Amino acid sequence: MKKILVIIVLNLCLTIPSQADNIRDFEIEGISIGDSLLEFVTLAEIDKFPRNEVGKYKRTLIQTNLEIYDSLLVTYKKNDNKYIIEGLTANIRIYSGINNCYKKMSSIEKEISSLFSNLTRKNWGILELDKPYQTYNPITYDFENKDRIQIACWDLRISKDKDNDRDLFKFSLMSSAYVNEIKLQAVE
């Protein structure tokens, strides 16, 4: 029953044409890579949303008017007056423990793998975050043009022995240009 629910949720979250061959064929909350953020929110709203910068890009956090996810992190180039979306991360808070996040991730991973045989999959394993005992476990799927899908669970523990049962599931779509910028930032 849980598997059916996850598949239904994934299908509601994502629009996938039967011949999807690049990241622009996907939607999260009706938004795709290559769309203008201005099609969904006003410039005044963008200015009100929390944001930060990553290299040549700005990221804006949207937490209002969402149907499925708790928040969206939308990435676009700093000096782009059209606000063309290069990255899109959907976040779901998980309050029932990291193992439930891993179950959700596993189900979605199987669904992505069954939809696409031509993507290059990589499980990065459990990686450490900046805070002690906090980790994340990303799995990436790369298209031939280097666009990327990433799913990940973030375990936001308080200490080695104390979990706060507040974890995060992330589903990301990234253009190849944004993936390259992330790689450059990681080297620096």
Question: How should these model regions be labeled?
Answer:
Residues 60-84:
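Compositionally biased P/S/T/G-rich terminal and signal peptide-adjacent segments
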Residues 21-65, 87-188:
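Non-cytosolic coordination micro-motifs
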Residues 4-18:
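Sec-dependent N-terminal signal peptides
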